[in-house]
């Protein structure tokens, strides 16, 4: 059997004899690329060569590059140990041409290596090409003699590679190995392509274009080649196994782990041994390349990798620090190819030993407290359940570990007392939950959390992943199974689906599984803040608790959520920048369609302020700076300048999002926005695309609200407004630029016409009051002891009634004037009383009588002038009669 070391060596030697320079692996920490946490692909060290920023003394190269994918978008950490091909550390074999050979030569070299040098059966190989790349399609037929049905055209981005929004790019061609029909799965491009039967072993990237901008792509004057072959994958193929962890290197590390812990390497401990083997490689190489455990950045990623392995070491029963004792096995397998491992042996061992010792301190603290609590007990005694619960609740010391520790001393734990203490805590928590206004039916989540714990969220760096169903809820009750057509809530042990929290709506997507299972996820909630509940409908198939499933987030929906959520952070920073540091977030809502942001401010924002805020946010988007995430304690985060967001609850560890750039008080570049946030975000601000404010309103006293859209929604919103503007311009028979002035002129003419009409109506009413033609019995008449003018006027602006009352008072020196105008069925009434009579007669009393007749309520004013109205304009004449009747009694 060919070993992994022999495969690596034969790959490099093959390309060396074909004119390539063997280039040693670059360190895992990128030397000239601040956008990357770790080198994660073979081409990374050559990036500046491909872009023309640097030159090399050779035109072709080959390498075996160390890579780590445990942070950023290439995060495989959560799947490691549970799948056949996920790793944190891996080696990428590659050959590169910097303007030398192109498609034909790279296909010749690739086919020659895998079929002639390594002897792979051509009948087990198929390739993919980009759907428009006819050149590559024809070359595969010519060079490899592959039939057309094994040259698969793919139209997705899987077969088109780009370095970013701009820069070198081009189509890809991937080589797949067929493990045979006994392995589930279909060829690439088929519905079941995610199965394990067809495995990609080599990706050939044809860099032939320069992406200038979103609309422009030019041919490169010197096309280049970048290829990548995962060493672990090709080793599994050449060694005749279907699982990378069954290859020689991993088998040796796993065997060492089993030997040191005296445990079986399969069965219940299989995944744990695999995690330890993989993470040992990652930790060893990272320390050798200068990364040390820390609470942020690369050091924090290393610490996560280490502690994940150390947790699994504890699970398999390791009583002492294990990881550092596995370093000799790592050097035995990989030290020859990577002498830096040998040089750093002492540092690697000491770093692992110290970190595991510190990590185990939590357990040690718990055991010490347990010893203090049991020193007075004798053989056969029982530890009170309340003590065991305090160990669990306060110190995180599991009940099972307490029981195991006491068993050796012939002591037991009062489990009933422990359960009672646990139940009492649950009761208190549920009472608090009910007191918060939540539905009583939500108690079901406490049962699930108590029995199964929370859901592990893997979606910060992944949109798809595997999971196991641990609970099902249908019609508010837990069930064991569900079938096609059921509306079901699914809880899994882990998920990439974000559950609604912190103002951000939940993810949607698809869940698939065996036997063509398909479920559509329409929402994801997060009850109790730690369970991810997938709200779904079963489109096809059946499910039961314990089923393994695949979860795929709707990437378009997720990306829109990311853009809107990151935009709220930028908006917050812009508001503080433009309005002052008094601005703080008071609430938010982030959906895929839009965002809403509530903030403290005492007055409405001017158009100029809104424009400045919008411009500042869009400038940060155009700058396209990278968004960075650090995991820190809340105290450290606040000390670092992070703002805590309204309504968020923070645990012992928080995510700190930094985005944008600005100059600080020391004239140094710093992040524009630094906030604590648990939501999902873009990786670079340019992914937001565009930001546009659609409204600014008041929520309550001192609280304002901005609603905005981003990306495609912003574009569509602006397109819609542009269409309305053009339609308005067409109606006005003007060009769009003239709409404001033309509209202002029309409104001015309308105001003039309305004033002229009001003046004419007023003049007519006065003429009637003077006994002119067309009068409506409006001449003064005697009512009781008083002079009275009463008139109903159709269509008069109610605002003109008061002035008309004053004009009529000049006609009668002492008396009462009652005027009613009717507009669209509604009546408005005004009554005036001469100054000489206001002590005897109140205009307010008279108006209220008229308003009552008109079907209204109230009415008010002064004794000499009062107004009111009612909906029954057809009762206007009767209202005047009611006023006269009241006046006769006065």
From Swiss-Prot:
Pfam families: DHHA1 (PF02272), tRNA-synt_2c (PF01411), tRNA_SAD (PF07973)
Keywords, ordered alphabetically: Aminoacyl-tRNA synthetase, ATP-binding, Cytoplasm, Ligase, Metal-binding, Nucleotide-binding, Protein biosynthesis, RNA-binding, tRNA-binding, Zinc
Primary localisation category: cytoplasm
Disulfide pairings: none
Cofactor binding notes: Binds 1 zinc ion per subunit.
Record localization: Cytoplasm
Family: Belongs to the class-II aminoacyl-tRNA synthetase family.
Listed name of the protein: Alanine--tRNA ligase
Species whose genome carries this gene: Zymomonas mobilis subsp. mobilis (strain ATCC 31821 / ZM4 / CP4)
Record gene name: alaS
């Amino acid at each position: 059997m060919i070993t992994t070391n022999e495969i690596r060596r034969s790959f490099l030697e093959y390309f060396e004899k074909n004119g390539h320079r063997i280039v040693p692996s670059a360190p895992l920490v990128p030397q000239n690329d601040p956008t990357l946490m770790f080198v994660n692909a073979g081409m990374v060290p050559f990036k500046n060569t491909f872009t023309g920023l640097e030159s090399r003394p050779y035109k072709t190269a080959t390498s075996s590059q160390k890579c780590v994918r445990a942070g950023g978008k290439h995060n495989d950490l959560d799947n490691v140990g549970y799948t056949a091909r996920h790793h944190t550390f891996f080696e990428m074999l590659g050959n590169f041409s910097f303007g030398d050979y192109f498609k034909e030569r790279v296909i010749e070299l690739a086919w020659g290596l895998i079929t002639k040098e390594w002897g792979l059966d051509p009948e087990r190989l198929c390739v993919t090409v980009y759907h428009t790349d006819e050149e590559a399609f024809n070359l595969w037929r010519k060079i490899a003699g592959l039939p057309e049905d094994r040259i698969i055209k793919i139209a997705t981005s899987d077969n088109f590679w780009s370095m970013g929004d701009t820069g070198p790019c081009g189509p890809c061609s991937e080589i797949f190995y067929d493990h045979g029909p006994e392995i589930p799965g279909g060829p690439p491009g088929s519905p079941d392509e995610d199965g394990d039967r067809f495995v990609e072993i080599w990706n050939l990237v044809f860099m032939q274009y320069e992406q200038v901008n979103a609309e422009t792509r030019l041919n490169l004057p010197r096309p280049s080649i970048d290829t990548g072959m995962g060493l672990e994958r090709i080793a599994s193929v050449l060694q005749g196994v279907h699982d990378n962890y069954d290859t020689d290197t991993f088998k040796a590390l796993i065997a060492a782990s089993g030997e040191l812990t005296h445990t079986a390497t399969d069965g219940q401990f299989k995944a744990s041994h695999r995690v330890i083997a993989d993470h040992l490689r990652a930790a060893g190489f990272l320390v050798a390349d200068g990364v040390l455990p820390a609470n942020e950045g690369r050091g924090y990623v290393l610490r996560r990798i280490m502690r994940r392995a150390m947790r699994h070491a504890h699970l398999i029963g390791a009583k002492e620090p294990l990881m550092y004792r596995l370093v000799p096995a790592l050097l035995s397998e990989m030290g020859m190819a990577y002498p830096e491992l040998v040089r750093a042996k002492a540092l690697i061992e000491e770093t692992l030993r110290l970190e595991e010792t510190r990590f185990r301190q939590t357990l040690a603290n718990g055991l010490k407290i347990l010893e203090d609590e049991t020193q007075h007990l004798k053989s056969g005694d029982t530890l009170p359940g309340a003590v065991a619960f305090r160990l669990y609740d306060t110190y995180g010391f599991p009940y099972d570990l307490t029981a195991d520790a006491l068993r050796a001393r012939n002591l037991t734990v009062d489990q009933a007392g422990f359960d009672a203490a646990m139940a009492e805590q649950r009761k208190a928590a549920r009472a608090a939950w009910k007191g918060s206004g939540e539905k009583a039916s939500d108690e079901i989540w406490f049962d699930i959390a108590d029995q199964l714990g929370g859901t592990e969220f893997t979606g910060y760096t992944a949109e798809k992943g595997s999971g196991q169903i641990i609970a099902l809820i249908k019609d508010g009750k837990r069930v064991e199974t569900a079938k096609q057509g059921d509306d079901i809530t699914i809880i899994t042990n882990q998920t990439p689906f974000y559950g609604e929290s912190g103002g951000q709506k939940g993810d949607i997507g698809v869940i698939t599984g065996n036997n063509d299972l398909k479920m559509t996820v329409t929402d994801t909630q997060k009850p109790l803040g730690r369970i991810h509940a997938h709200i779904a409908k079963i489109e096809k198939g059946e499910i039961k608790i314990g089923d393994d499933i695949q979860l795929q987030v709707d990437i378009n929906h997720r990306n829109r959520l990311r853009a809107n959520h990151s935009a709220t952070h930028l908006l917050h920073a812009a508001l503080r920048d433009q309005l002052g540091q008094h601005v703080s977030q008071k609430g938010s809502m982030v959906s895929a369609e839009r965002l809403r942001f509530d903030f403290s401010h005492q007055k409405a924002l001017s158009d100029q302020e809104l424009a400045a805020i919008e411009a500042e946010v869009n400038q940060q988007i155009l700058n396209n700076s990278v968004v960075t995430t650090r995991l820190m304690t809340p105290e450290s985060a606040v000390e670092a300048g992070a703002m805590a967001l309204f309504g968020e609850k923070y645990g012992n560890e928080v995510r700190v999002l930094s985005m944008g750039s600005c100059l600080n008080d020391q004239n140094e570049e710093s992040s524009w926005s630094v906030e604590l946030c648990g939501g999902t975000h873009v990786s670079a601000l340019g992914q937001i695309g565009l930001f546009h404010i659609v409204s600014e309103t008041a929520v309550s006293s001192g609280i304002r609200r901005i609603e905005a859209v981003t990306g495609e929604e912003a574009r569509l919103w602006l397109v819609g407004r542009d269409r309305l503007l053009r339609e308005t311009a067409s109606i006005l028979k003007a060009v769009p630029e003239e709409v404001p002035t033309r509209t202002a002129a029309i409104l001015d003419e309308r105001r003039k016409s309305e004033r002229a009409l009001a003046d004419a109506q007023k003049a007519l009413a006065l003429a009637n009051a003077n006994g002119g033609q067309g009068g409506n019995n409006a001449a003064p008449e005697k009512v009781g002891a008083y002079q009275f003018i009463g008139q109903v006027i159709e269509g008069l602006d109610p605002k003109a009634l008061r002035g008309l009352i004053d004009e009529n008072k000049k006609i009668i020196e002492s008396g009462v004037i009652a005027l009613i105008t009717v507009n669209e069925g509604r009546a408005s009434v005004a009554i005036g009383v001469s100054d000489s009579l206001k002590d005897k007669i109140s205009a307010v009393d008279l108006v209220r009588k008229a308003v009552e007749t008109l079907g209204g309520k109230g009415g008010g004013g002064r004794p000499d002038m009062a107004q009111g109205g009612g909906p029954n304009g057809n009762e206007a004449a009767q209202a005047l009669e009611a006023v006269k009747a009241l006046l006769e009694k006065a």
